Structures are given as C-alpha cells and as structure tokens.
C-alpha cells in the first residue's frame, strides 16, 4: 500500500533525476525509466488527488534556470510534451482527440523529435531580438548573445509573409560530426569527454564567453509557432515551408497523417534513418494539425492536450563477452566490467559494459564467452540485460570476484551490510590513488579545468603527483614532459590550477573525501564552520547540533580529522595557496570593492569571466552585464567589446588586469 510518505519520496526522486538531466546534464537512468517513474507518480495522484501540491513534478515543467544568466518571462508558456513508448498509447491518444474535437477524422502533423535543447526565438520587424531557454516553462535564461554565435541562425529574416512580430520554438543541437571532432580534441587535451551531443549542446549554450560558444559550432532548427505569432498560418503542416520562405532553418522529415497506420509507418521510416541522420533524435512528435483545434483543447498540467511524443525505446543488440575485468574505484570498491566484442549501437561503438557487482553477475549468471543482449538508452552507460543460455560455450565456468586486488595484490574484504567488495589498501593501492586524484580535480571537487583523467594518470606515472596537494606544487618543467603538451596547453593547465585555489568551502570539503559526506552535508558543514580550520576543531557534540547532520556523519568527520595524515594534507594544501571560502562568511571586510559595481569585458589572462566575478563578489562588490552611469569600474581584458567604448564615453574608470589584481589584494 502506497503512503503519502512514499509519494513524497517519489516526488523527491523525480526532481533529483530532473536536476541530473536538465541542469547537470549527467543522467543516471534512461528516458524510459524516468517516464516510468512519472507514470507511477500520475497513477498515485489519480488515486490520491488530495496529496498533490504545486511542487509535484507532474504540475511543473522541468526547471533548468542557470546562475550567470538573466532570466526572462516567456510571453507564451513553453510547455513540455507527454511521452509514450507504444503503438497502443498512440492509438489511445488519437481516440481521445477524436472525442475532444468531436470529429471522426482528425488530421495530424508528425515530425522528428530532436534530442537537443528547446529554445524560443523572438524576431521583431524581421530582426532577431531574443533567445530564451525553456527554463521552468514560465521563465527561462536569456541566451540571446550566445544564440547570435550559432552560424545557421539568421539574424535578419525576409519574405512576403513575414509578420512584424514572430515568436518561434526550436531546438539547439550539436551536429554529430562536430561532436565527434570536438570530443577527439578533448581526448587529446586530456579533458573529460561529453557523453553525447545533447550534453555538449547544453553545456555550450550556458558558456559565459560567446567566443567559446562560436567555437562549439552549434546549429538550430525551428518547428513551431507560439500562439498568435502569425495569423496567416492556420495549420502545423504549413509551418516548415513558411519558415523556409522567410529564411529560417526548419525541420526536415515531416508527414501529414490521418490515422494510426500512417503515423506508425512514418515512425518506422524514421527509426530506420535514425543512425544515419547528421543529428540525434529520440522519437517523433504527433501534433493536431489545425491551430483552432489546438487552441480549443488547451493544456493539462504542464503539457498540451493536442500533442504527444512517441519516444523510441532504448536500442538493443547481441554480442559476446570476451572477458570480465575488474575496475577499482577511489573508495576501493571492485566493479566487474564486461569486455565485449565491439558492436555499433545507438550511434557509437560499444566495447564495455558495467556489471555493477558480484551479486548482479551471479543473479544473471553472466560468464566469459556468453552471448548477451546489451542495451543503451539515452545517456546511460551500456548494460547487459540477459544471457542467451542456448548459445553458452560447453565448458564455461561461473565468474567469481578475485580474492586479491588486481592493482596492489591486497586481500579484498566484504563489509557486513554492503554488497560491495573492497580493497582495504587505501594508502598504497595504485588504482585507488589515481582514482582519488581524478575525483579531486573533477567538477564535484576542485574542478580543475584542462586536467582530465589521462593527464592525471601521466602525472602519477611520472612520479610528479602522489597526493592531491602535489598538484599545486607542479612546475611548468614537469608538465612540459607530458605527451603532446606544447606551450599553450602548459599555460592553460598552470592557469587552471591557479584559478582552482579559490574554491568554495563546501567543494573543498567534498574534495577531502570524508566518508558519508555528499554536497548537501558539505554545504551544512561549511555554513556552520565558516573555515576549514574551524571544521577541523569541531567535536561530535558540536557537529550533531547542526540540523541535518547525524551521529554517523559527525563521527566520520571527527575521525577523518583525527588522522594526522589527513590533517597534514589539509595544511599543505593551505600552504600551497588553496583558499577555501564559505559563502556565508564575509572574508573581506571594508574592502575597496564593497558596494561597487563592476562590468567585465574582454578575455583576462589569469582568470575566466566567472572566477573574476567570484573575486569581486567575495570582496563585497557586484557584477553587472551592462555599463551605465551607476557602474564604478570596467575591467578590460584582451579584445574588449563595446562596453569599453561606453565606459570611456561616460568617464567610468577602466582597470587593466594588473590593476584589477592589485586592487583585489
């Protein structure tokens, strides 16, 4: 029996996955699994409408507002579509519309469902004026400047039927070939690879430097009109040709359909084209064709009644397991990995699949030599679904987890209450040390740009780094010994290491890898302690008083800092210039920046735009996007824009980077 507490827990779970998908762009479940959670939620809400609140995921469009961008209201709400995965559900949708419209024969416009980032574009008198992300459906991020960097976006339209005001819906995406080229470059630079083109497009659109956006070679395609944007267009099927007539890039591969068989035929045609299209799609969209009927049906919750998305199921394929290897994580957990005969699936070649743990291997009875079915859905790593027992080799043997760590030879242990098998040699196990360093430089912790996994491994193998603090003692001479590292790459890495020293206290706490500490708990500890030195002095009694911190966490924190090795590492990090700062503590009092308004323009040599803005805010200043008479200083780097001209016209003081750094200190 479902309780209200179960319902609330499900709401939190869905919002967690929303955040991973829309904001962090790192989903851990497939689209199909996510939609199953939503369907379960909706079933509960039908049975218990009294439990529904405005915070239910069923009542709101997935939020993805981002700090660093101005948010603006949508003139017409930007809704999301309801999803389906079966022919039967499409038939139910058609019958429902026939009943609502009051017609036996209903016309549909069917088109591709792009797997990109939904946006709105506004044109006035044919001139591109504004680009906005979906955001929460009511408000979105103003990405106008970044959208201007998209090469195939026309900044001016023309044509006989061009209205004075045009609000249109579209999708920004990264073409597959561009994605492959840029990922290859990231690989050479030792950076973390993008999981897929959608993640790449999402991250690129939110860059604060428009020049970097241009380098990502994004593209845009348009598929819809906002309500009342063009009175001359009466039906959805007319939209693509209308867009092309005024110079807009429009969706290809669309169909006019009148029944389920025509829709299904189109779906099958598109499914067969999916892997050869130059961009990613994840299904088709079925829309009621007549705009009058669309308007009459309106919306329900967060979705239009007159449209639905049919999403292609995760693709599956059969291949053979040629070996089962073991991967050691930073906490010593041993994870079995299936090494596969390479097979092309969902647009990429699959050669490995995680088997999660020994229990999973035993439950599915997965063995070396087995023919298995693998699945790859959306962004999720490939997984082994089942074994073809009829194809099993005669003398195959059940697989067993090794008794000794493959990296260091230490006997592994099973901790009571845990499925995981661990290597206890955390200080000397090479693989654990490397994984800890990779985590330390990653986004959840110190977020050191240009220092990817391959670079960490090279630095470790050459003996240049062993502890995290060694990273901040690296020299240009050491980095120059890395493979394919030339002057610019060396400078980029040295600058990134320097910039990472200014880190929030909660991320610094995360970087220390204290047991049981996630980002939420790290934020609570940072807010209470204010400095890392204070946190190191707190006892269990002090820590338990913090709301949200239990005895288990308090004990783990105290035990961590009681270890002389851990304390020594923190002190060395601080000595090397790492400066963890709490958002809740005023580090700088009576600073020259206090209450002053800054505008940043051009490229700085030692700071990104974001890190320079953080320095200003930490010292009590404010950062504005535009120059006005209220602006106190303009900080100008290389190749400044029109903001510098305006500052000079208004007589506002202009600081070069050297002067800015001097004022900071």
From Swiss-Prot:
Native source organism of the sequence: Protochlamydia amoebophila (strain UWE25)
Record GO biological process: DNA repair; DNA replication
InterPro entries: BRCT_dom, BRCT_dom_sf, DisA/LigA_HHH, DNA_ligase, DNA_ligase_AS, DNA_ligase_CS, DNAligase_adenylation, DNAligase_N
Recorded coiled-coil stretches: none
GO cellular component, one term: cytosol
Cofactor(s) in the UniProt record: Mg(2+); Mn(2+)
Name by which UniProt lists this protein: DNA ligase
Enzyme Commission designation: 6.5.1.2
Reactions accelerated catalytically: NAD(+) + (deoxyribonucleotide)n-3'-hydroxyl + 5'-phospho-(deoxyribonucleotide)m = (deoxyribonucleotide)n+m + AMP + beta-nicotinamide D-nucleotide
SMART domains xref list: BRCT, HhH1, LIGANc
Family: Belongs to the NAD-dependent DNA ligase family. LigA subfamily.
Residues that hold NAD(+) according to the record: 31-35, 80-81, 111, 134, 171, 287, 311
Gene name tied to this protein: ligA
């Amino acid at each position: 029996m479902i309780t209200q507490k179960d319902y609330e827990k499900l709401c939190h779970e869905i919002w967690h996955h929303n955040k991973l998908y829309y904001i962090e762009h790192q989903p851990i479940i497939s689209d199909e699994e996510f939609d199953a959670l939503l369907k379960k939620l909706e079933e509960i809400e039908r049975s218990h409408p009294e439990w529904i609140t405005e915070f239910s995921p069923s009542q709101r469009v997935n939020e993805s507002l981002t700090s660093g961008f101005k948010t603006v209201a949508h003139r017409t709400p930007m809704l999301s579509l309801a999803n389906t995965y079966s022919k039967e559900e499409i038939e139910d949708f058609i019958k429902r519309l026939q009943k609502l419209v009051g017609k036996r024969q209903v016309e549909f416009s069917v088109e591709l469902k792009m797997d990109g980032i939904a946006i709105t574009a506004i044109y006035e008198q044919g001139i591109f004026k504004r680009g906005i992300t979906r955001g929460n459906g009511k408000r979105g991020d103003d990405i106008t400047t970044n959208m201007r960097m998209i090469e195939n976006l026309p900044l001016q339209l023309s044509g006989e039927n061009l209205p004075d005001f045009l609000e249109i819906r579209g999708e920004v995406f990264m073409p597959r070939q561009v994605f492959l080229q840029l990922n290859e470059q990231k690989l050479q630079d030792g950076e973390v690879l993008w999981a897929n083109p959608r993640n790449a497009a999402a991250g690129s659109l939110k860059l604060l430097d428009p020049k970097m956006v241009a380098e990502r070679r994004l593209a845009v395609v348009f598929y819809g009109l906002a309500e009342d944007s063009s009175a001359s267009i009466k039906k959805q099927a007319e939209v693509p040709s209308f867009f092309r007539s005024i110079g807009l890039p429009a969706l290809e591969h669309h169909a006019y359909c009148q029944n389920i068989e025509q829709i299904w035929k189109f779906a099958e045609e598109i499914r067969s084209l999916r892997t050869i299209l130059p961009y990613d799609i994840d299904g088709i969209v079925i829309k009621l064709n007549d705009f009058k009927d669309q308007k009459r049906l309106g919306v329900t919750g967060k979705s239009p009644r007159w449209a639905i998305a049919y999403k292609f199921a995760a693709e599956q394929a059969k291949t053979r397991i040629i070996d089962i290897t073991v991967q050691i994580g930073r906490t010593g957990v041993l994870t079995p990995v299936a090494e596969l005969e390479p097979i092309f699936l969902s647009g990429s070649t699959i050669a490995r699949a995680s088997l999660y743990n020994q229990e999973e291997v035993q439950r599915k009875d997965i063995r070396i030599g087995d023919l298995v079915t693998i699945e790859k859905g959306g962004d999720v790593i490939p997984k082994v679904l089942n074994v073809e027992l009829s194809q099993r080799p005669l003398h195959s043997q059940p697989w067993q987890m090794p008794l000794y760590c493959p990296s260091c030879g230490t006997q592994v242990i099973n901790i009571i209450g845990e499925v995981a098998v661990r290597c206890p040699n955390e200080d000397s196990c090479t693989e654990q040390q490397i994984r800890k360093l990779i985590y330390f430089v990653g986004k959840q912790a110190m977020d050191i740009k240009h220092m990817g996994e391959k670079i960490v491994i090279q630095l470790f193998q050459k003996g240049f780094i062993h502890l995290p603090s060694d990273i901040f003692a690296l020299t240009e001479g050491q980095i120059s010994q890395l493979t394919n590292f030339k002057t610019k790459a060396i400078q980029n890495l040295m600058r990134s290491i320097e910039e990472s020293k200014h880190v929030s206290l909660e991320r610094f706490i995360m970087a220390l890898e204290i047991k049981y500490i996630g980002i939420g708990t790290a934020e609570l500890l940072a807010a209470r302690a204010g400095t890392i030195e204070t946190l190191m002095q707190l006892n269990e009694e002090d820590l338990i008083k913090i709301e949200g911190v239990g005895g288990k966490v308090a004990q783990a924190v105290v035990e961590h800092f009681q270890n002389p090795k851990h304390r020594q590492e923190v002190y060395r990090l601080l000595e090397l210039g790492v400066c963890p700062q709490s958002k809740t503590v005023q580090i700088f009092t009576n600073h020259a920046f206090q209450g002053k308004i800054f505008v940043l323009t051009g490229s700085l040599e030692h700071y990104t735009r974001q890190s320079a803005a953080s320095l200003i805010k930490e010292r009590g200043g404010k950062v504005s996007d535009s120059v006005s008479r209220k602006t106190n200083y303009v900080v100008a780097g290389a190749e400044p824009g029109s903001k510098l001209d305006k500052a000079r016209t208004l007589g506002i003081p202009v600081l070069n980077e050297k002067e800015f750094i001097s004022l900071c200190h």
